[in-house]
Structure formats: structure tokens, C-alpha cells
């Protein structure tokens, strides 16, 4: 049975592309001003001054974020709570789901009807579509947003609200920052030099480095580089698809290709899995990686691995930390897909939703308005305490004092990214890593790919919820071992995965996805 959905009629593509996303703030898609943030009403400290909202009764709110609580987190949020108490007569308690546990525990918050109000979410990788299909998030009407978060409504681009819609309803407040979806690597520069490598700019280069590490008795990474691989093939995850979008891909580098690709029937996936088996057999990473509770950065920071794959900003953050603690490692950054044009993430790649069971939805939205548009709250959440963690340089820059207790943008503040008030870092003593980061970022900005209509598509699984749940329940028995090369026989394992997916209903999911995609493309064509 063919798992790749049939190609949609190419005529639907004409005029169907969404407006191009620029790599800077204020690309002309918003309703309000995206100019000088310090002159906006939100930036002037008037956010939250909503005369229509009743704040006479004190409420205690709870928000869930992703990651780990940093040492100074509670101290920082105590400062934020002082502002919230004064302006909104409420307090905010924050709980965390770690990187290692959010895949399993996120949905349990809703199935157990845990009492909380706000939660970080994101398309595909952080459970947005799946939670909406289960009824976990409160729908946010235009009137509700305008009433309780008027400043957010003025700032967030119209395109972002459109991307957040599922079946015509908005269920998250999307972030406003243009981010790149391509993964890069933070890599031990001393080892690259040892192996005679000046840079890693292609998949072949990356495999050469991994093999050199294995031959040298050093783990190259904490697992198989699946994202860099499918990105090297020009593919991207599909919003709302099973396994965080990774089970069904689309050819984002080719706007005329409207065929979804189920990985079990993709020859390149089979070849990748065999290559990963060869690598793990050679010792490129631990054979016990599936049982590890380590965070993604743990291997690099402890010296157990030679690299870490993540986004630009995160690789810079942990690369700097590694270099501060081990200067001789000379951690640098590389783009293993240097010659490919770059995809800009949709705005719903980060966001915040309100729990459908929240007893204080209005106050929760008002709190989010503060996080998103009040510069005092925004700076605290992103940078920490001024004078302890950072200091201001002019009106729109900051200089790091100490990141050990509260790292810059390392505390899941990404859900309310707002580039109209976000400070840029002033780097007094630039390092080679800073320069490499800027070089790669500039290269990304100068090589943005053409839009693909599916870049903004998000699959709604509610019509195939039984099949979707069955696929999600069965896939981990095969998927994680395969992408990390931890199987005895690749072909037999993929065949077994396909049989399990057949039984679970993967074809029903693909058929429904194909139907929705056809409607989505037709709707874009009309617009």
C-alpha cells in the first residue's frame, strides 16, 4: 500500500503561496506599528491597563514551561510577581516539564484535569495540534484577545493569528519573532582540528566527523542526527502529523511538490537508518542512548560527546558555556547544510495557550499580555535581574553579567517572543564563537528559501483521532531505535514498523491529511 499521498493538482498551487517571511522583525504582516518599540504604548508601560477587566479579586495562577528550572529562576519570577500583584492583583506559580519528560507528561496534564492556567506550546514539536484535538486548550476569540490582551493584538502579525487557527479557531498566542528551522551543530573545534577538518558544510562532512570521532574512541553525539539528515534532503516536518510532525514530511525546498512523504516508504529513510546502524556499531554514540535521561546539551557540556545538534541560538548558548568551562575545547558552530536555502519557522513554532479548564482565563490572558508587551516583565523573563544577570547598554541592548544562574533566553520565555521590544546583545569581548554565530546567522538571512504552501499548514487529527492515537502508541517501539541505528536488521525493523502503522491506520491519517491539504491550498488560492 502506498503511504505517500498522491500529488495534488498542480494548478491549485498557482497564487497559493503565503506572503514571504522576512528574517527581521516587522515584515509588513502586522496590524499595528512594528517600528521603534520604545515609542509604542506597550513599551511605555501601559500594557495591562484594561478598564474593562475586573481584577478586584486576587487570584493565584499556574503556568507550565518546558525545560529545567535554573538556579535563580524563582528569584527572577518573584520580581515578576511584584509587578503582577501591583498591576493585575494576581500571582504566578511556574512548573516545568523537562526536555526528557514533556513528550509523555504533557498530555497527562489535560487527561488528569490538573488545575493550571497557562502552558507553553508549539506546532508539531510541543503538542499544539494534538492538544487542540483533545479539547485541552481554550479557544481565543478576537473579542477575548482584544479585551484582555489589547497590546498583544496590536503587535502580533495577522499571519501569525492565521497560522494559529485550527478549524477556524485560535488556540494559542503565537510568538512574534522570525526564527530559522534549520538545525546547526555546536562542535568541539579541537577535535575538528585533530581530524584535519576546517568546517562541516555538508552531510558527507558530518559523517566524516562522526566516523573520525568513533575511530578515536569518542562519542560524536547523543544519537542519530535525524533532523540534519532530512533537512539535507530538502524536507521538513508537517505540522500536526504524528510524532511531532516527523513521521510525515513534505518537500519544503520545492514549492511545486505537494506530496506528503510517510517516512516508512521513503528510500532515503531506509538508507539513513542503515548508515546510523553502521555508526552506532562503530561507537559513534552510546548503545544505551534510548535509556538515557540526559538533556540534549549534557553530552557536550560534560565532554562525553563531541557535538550537539540544535538551533542557532541554543548552540551559541551552550557553546559559550562549554568554552567558559573548558577553553581548550574551542567549541565552534557549523552548518551541515550550508548550501541549502533556509526555512523560516512559522510563528506558531513557539506560543502560549490557556488551559480549557482554567478558572481564570481572563486574568491568565492579562498576565500573558504583560509578559508579551511590558518591557519590565519581558526583560526579567528573558534576561533575568538587571544588575545581577545583565546590564542595559543604551535603550535597546544588554550586556551579560552572569548567566550561571539565569541564562539569556534559556528559561522557556520563547512563547512570548516579541521582537519589537527585545534587546540585542552587546558583546564587549567578542570570541571566535560569537563571530561564527554572526557569520552563520547572516548567511541564513541572505539565503531564505521560497515559501512552500505547506509551511503554514497544520493537520487537524480530530477526524482520525482513534488512528492517530494508535499510531502514536505504536511508533516508539520502532521509530526511536531506527533513527538511532539501534536495531539488528534495518530492513526487517522498517517492515515491522510499516506493518504496525498499517494496523494502526496510517493510511487513514494520510488520506485525511491529503483532503485537508487540498482544501487548504484551494483556500490560499482564493485569498
Whereabouts are the PLM-identified features?
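N-terminal secretory signal peptides that target proteins for export/translocation
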Residues: 1-4
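Extracytoplasmic/secretory soluble proteins
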Residues: 8, 12-13, 20-527
